[in-house]
Amino acid sequence: MVKIRHTRPEDLPAMQEIFADARAFMRENGNPDQWGDKFPTQEMIDKDIALHRSYVCEDEGKIVATFAFTTDGEPTYRVIHGGAWLDDAQYGVVHRIAAAKGTRGAASFCMNWCMEQCGNIRIDTHANNKPMQGLLKKLGYTYCGVIELENGRGERLAFQKRVEK
């Protein structure tokens, strides 16, 4: 049975392995810069756990994916260039989503779970992250424009999906 739950400290080794696999996958697929060699940092992961926004996806008790999710907004989403968000309603944000090597469907499962939590999701990704862009398109996300990361760390393509009422 597949389920999503909050991250626990004992999940860290599995998460680190998943993040390492994700970094290698990105490099192999023409996206060496988005996560580099050390992203996400341990400090980021610890903060996500402390703020209860770090989650893991388990399949038959094995961790197959991890992500950060919050409905507290995202400061870098206040300004968007070359487009506009679909609405100004409260939204959830997904960050640092990664699936274990060889896992199929886990990222879609996680994204769908997030949508079930609030019905309005915003997410951003690197221009070179074609696999993620493909997943977002497959799941029905709309490209909204470009956002700028904090501290001049670059730009990201911004997407949104909402439950139609």
Stretch-by-stretch model annotation:
Residues 124, 142-156:
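Conserved catalytic-core motifs of GNAT/GCN5-like acyltransferases
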Residues 68-102:
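Conserved acyl-donor/pantetheine-binding loop and adjacent beta-alpha core of acyl/acetyltransferases
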Residues 23-43:
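Conserved GNAT-fold acetyl-CoA-binding loop/helix
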Residues 3-17:
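A short beta-loop-alpha structural element at the N-terminal edge
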Residues 52-69:
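Conserved beta-hairpin
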Residues 128-145:
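Conserved active-site alpha-helix within GNAT-family acetyltransferase domains
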Residues 99-116, 133-138:
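Conserved acetyl-CoA-binding loop-helix of GNAT-fold acetyltransferases
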Residues 117-128:
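Conserved GNAT acetyl-CoA-binding A-motif
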